[in-house]
């Protein structure tokens, strides 16, 4: 009797337990139905199309080591932007829609630029892309900031190939420069048999209908000058002509039976920004803004003979691009993994030729996809917005893509288990940025908030008369409000001590004259007022140089000695343009005992607690004046 009562109780408990879960499941389904779909408002590509076979190419570029999302706190509102967990979810949604018809390709600059990449020696990125099923990548400009040994290690760890047809090893006399997993191009096979298109063709009793579609991908690395390569071990490496290598490889792929050829290149293009941020489905007939005809990728595409390539996944310029240059579709995204785009290639069976052909008029681009935990309901994005304007964008809501909720994907759980504890301490708040609602971005003009904060701290820590820094070393932006520790570490990812040395006024003038017309212009300074003029050939040059304390200008005495500060990477290792300066100048009174520049910036800002950026830049009295 006792056992039967236990059984009845057990059955009742199970029934109650099951019933209690039913409303939750129903509520969840209802909740998902109510989510906004960021892809609503245009016609999607139909995976079950009976006329065309679509292959979806997901393109990423310039992720710069950002595995974790960027945390934003605007007034009372907290949200995030980016994060590979959410990018992974998009890709898996597509894979469910287009089984075995998704190609995930990365166009370079994968490692340099984040705290987590530094902490893991870049391994967090390779491990993540391995788990996400990346199909191929190429080398970006900042891949060469690392040693060749580092790059070869990353290539060997990758479960995907690195593609680059224009890198040549002069010593080994081969294009396969960085190991067995680096190849110049690759063919990808897609099974057509599980589609309505193929089944309909078979029902028509057509003979010898191909059951696969083969496309090729040619990789091109950014062409680098010797002076631009910061890593060691590349003395034997040279870069071959873009057009020649692409044409040769594309022809070989076509001869091998590839129906379409896609270029994967860390080469940049900039297109007008007016219509670039709204998620949409773009076609060759879509209205689009202009693209800069002087950019490398534009010129390369324009130089090609017809039929060489059918699409491009680009990078380097950190721009949202979903444009056609004549009849070639190009996708590229902003940096840090905040966006991605999809290139849909359609294929149709040509009965008379008994082959599949790509139909360029039906190519579509979907993007830019916002990589977000939540989106603003009105903009369907999660970018930084000003505190005074945030109410115009609210609320922040969960969302779906192609009918499926975008949420943190569990594909990368093992990465979190391995690295979260190591990274968590970098979420500590260091200070609060005030005085502006604008993002503090890196600029090339040599006089901007972020750069001026760095050079000001150099001067305060060393007491130098003049401080110099390279904008090329700064790798991220800061937003107003609370500044976490990882933002400081993302800004300067290299470990390098702050140094002082002695120079005469004449030597400072010679150095600045070279730096401000070198490869990495314009250098950031504290303690100097510069006038930059243009010569008859249209080239800028340093025409005047004075000492400057932020208010008053005084003459730089040519024979007098001054204390100068910069980082060890520049003055001791000859980084960037300093290699040529060290050809004629030997540092005197060199002292590099001040500590790491990143540690010093963190220490100073933490002590300040509140940092008003308005004191770091005077619009009416700039440190650099340009005269045409």
Residue ranges and their predicted role:
Residues 25-368, 373, 445, 449-457, ...:
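Acidic, metal/ion-coordinating pockets
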Residues 17-24:
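Bacterial Sec-dependent signal peptides at the C-terminal "C-region" and cleavage site
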Residues 4-17:
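Cleavable N-terminal signal peptides of Sec/SRP-targeted secreted and luminal proteins
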Residues 15, 115, 128, 473-478:
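Compositionally biased, low-hydrophobicity segments enriched in charged and small polar residues
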Residues 29-96, 196, 200, 228-243, ...:
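Catalytic centers of hydrolytic enzymes
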Residues 5-8, 297, 412, 578:
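Short amphipathic alpha-helical segments that mediate assembly, nucleic-acid/protein binding
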């Amino acid at each position: 009797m006792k056992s039967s009562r236990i059984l009845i109780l057990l059955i009742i408990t199970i029934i109650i337990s099951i019933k209690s879960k039913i409303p939750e499941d129903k509520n969840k389904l209802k909740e998902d139905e109510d989510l906004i779909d960021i892809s609503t408002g245009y016609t999607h590509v139909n995976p079950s199309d009976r006329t065309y076979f679509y292959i979806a190419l997901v393109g990423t570029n310039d992720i710069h080591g950002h595995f974790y999302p960027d945390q934003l706190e605007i007034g009372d509102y907290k949200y995030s932007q980016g994060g590979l967990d959410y990018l992974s979810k998009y890709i898996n949604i597509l894979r469910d829609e287009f089984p075995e018809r998704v190609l995930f390709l990365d166009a370079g600059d994968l490692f340099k630029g984040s705290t987590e990449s530094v902490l893991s020696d870049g391994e967090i990125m390779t491990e993540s892309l391995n788990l996400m099923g990346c199909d191929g990548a190429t080398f970006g400009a900042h891949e060469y900031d690392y040693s060749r040994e580092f790059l070869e290690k990353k290539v060997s760890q990758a479960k995907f190939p690195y593609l680059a047809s224009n890198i040549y090893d002069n010593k080994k006399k081969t294009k396969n420069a960085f190991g067995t997993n680096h190849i110049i191009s690759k063919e990808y096979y897609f099974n057509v048999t599980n589609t309505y298109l193929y089944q309909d063709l078979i029902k028509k009793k057509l003979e010898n209908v191909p059951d696969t579609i083969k496309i090729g991908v040619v990789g091109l690395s950014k062409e680098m000058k010797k002076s631009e390569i910061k890593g060691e071990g590349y003395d034997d490496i040279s870069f071959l002509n873009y057009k020649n290598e692409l044409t040769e490889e594309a022809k070989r792929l076509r001869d091998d039976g590839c129906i379409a050829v896609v270029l994967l290149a860390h080469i940049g293009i900039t297109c007008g920004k007016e219509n670039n941020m709204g998620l949409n489905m773009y076609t060759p007939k879509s209205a689009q803004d202009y693209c800069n005809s002087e950019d490398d990728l534009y010129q390369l595409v324009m130089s090609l003979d017809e039929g060489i390539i059918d699409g491009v996944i680009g990078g380097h310029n950190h721009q949202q691009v979903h444009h056609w240059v004549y009849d070639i579709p190009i996708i590229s995204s902003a940096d840090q993994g905040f966006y991605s785009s999809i290139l849909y290639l359609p294929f149709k069976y040509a009965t008379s030729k008994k082959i599949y052909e790509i139909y360029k008029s039906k190519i579509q681009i979907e993007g830019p996809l916002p990589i977000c935990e939540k989106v603003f309901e009105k903009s369907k994005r999660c970018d930084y917005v000003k505190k005074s304007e945030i109410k115009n964008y609210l609320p922040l809501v969960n969302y779906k893509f192609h009918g499926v909720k975008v949420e943190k994907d569990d594909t990368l759980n093992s990465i979190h288990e391995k690295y979260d504890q190591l990274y968590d301490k970098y979420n500590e708040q260091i200070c609060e940025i005030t005085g502006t609602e604008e993002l503090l971005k890196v600029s090339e003009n040599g006089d901007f908030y972020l750069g001026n904060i760095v050079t000001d701290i150099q001067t305060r820590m060393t007491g130098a008369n003049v401080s110099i820094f390279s904008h090329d070393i700064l790798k991220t932006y800061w937003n107003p409000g609370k500044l976490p520790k990882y933002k400081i570490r993302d800004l300067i990812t290299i470990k390098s001590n702050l140094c002082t040395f002695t120079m005469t006024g004449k030597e400072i003038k010679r150095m600045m004259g070279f730096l401000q017309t070198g490869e990495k212009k314009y250098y950031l300074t504290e303690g100097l007022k510069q006038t930059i003029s243009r010569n008859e050939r249209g080239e800028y040059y340093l025409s005047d140089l004075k000492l400057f304390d932020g208010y008053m200008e005084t003459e730089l005495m040519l024979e007098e000695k001054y204390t100068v500060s910069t980082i060890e990477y520049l003055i001791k290792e000859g980084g960037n343009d300093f290699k040529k300066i060290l050809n004629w100048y030997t540092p005197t009174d060199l002292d590099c005992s001040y500590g790491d520049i990143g540690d010093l910036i963190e220490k100073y800002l933490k002590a300040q607690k509140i940092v008003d950026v308005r004191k770091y830049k005077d619009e009416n009295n700039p440190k650099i004046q340009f005269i045409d």
